[in-house]
């Protein structure tokens, strides 16, 4: 089966106040920290106004949401990755998760079993659908939901076969799953990162 790595970087960042993907932390942009957990061959899905900025930073495979679903959130991003690339299994990660470890993503990929449509971790009781593995066969379900403007990812998970994994069972640290929505979240990064051993 062919694997594709997908970084979702199309959020409006309203609560943060500026595009989170490009905010610098420890000398690197947040999206670069997240991308490190995926590997070099990564497709980025973003907003039209950010495409040039990613390309200027050396990113070659950057796409905007496929029509007619532009700006319709993470589901549109995942659908676009399916549509634009030739793969079977898609490792999906949000760009605002700078502490996620590569070993965690590899463990999730390893746990994709026959018949499952997705592998989704749970950390501290929170389901993490944007740090997950999806099979391309869910594309028709995604299309239907987007067409109906049902944009909640929890609705998608309710319609497909999901293998849920407790983060501690794959040796993942809860700190890995912090996602940066606000300035307060960003200010906690240093403290959270101190509890991690980087790969």
From Swiss-Prot:
Its EC number is 2.7.7.77. Keywords: Cytoplasm, GTP-binding, Magnesium, Metal-binding, Molybdenum cofactor biosynthesis, Nucleotide-binding, Transferase. Its main location: cytoplasm. Pfam families: NTP_transf_3. Mg(2+) binds at residue 96. GO terms for molecular function: GTP binding; metal ion binding; molybdenum cofactor guanylyltransferase activity; nucleotidyltransferase activity. Transmembrane segments: none annotated. The keyword Cytoplasm applies. It is found in: Cytoplasm. GTP binds at residues 8-10, 20, 65, 96. The keyword GTP-binding applies. CDD domains: MobA. Gene3D superfamilies: Spore Coat Polysaccharide Biosynthesis Protein SpsA, Chain A. GO terms for cellular component: cytoplasm. It catalyses: Mo-molybdopterin + GTP + H(+) = Mo-molybdopterin guanine dinucleotide + diphosphate. Transfers a GMP moiety from GTP to Mo-molybdopterin (Mo-MPT) cofactor (Moco or molybdenum cofactor) to form Mo-molybdopterin guanine dinucleotide (Mo-MGD) cofactor. Belongs to the MobA family. This is Probable molybdenum cofactor guanylyltransferase. It comes from Bacillus subtilis (strain 168).
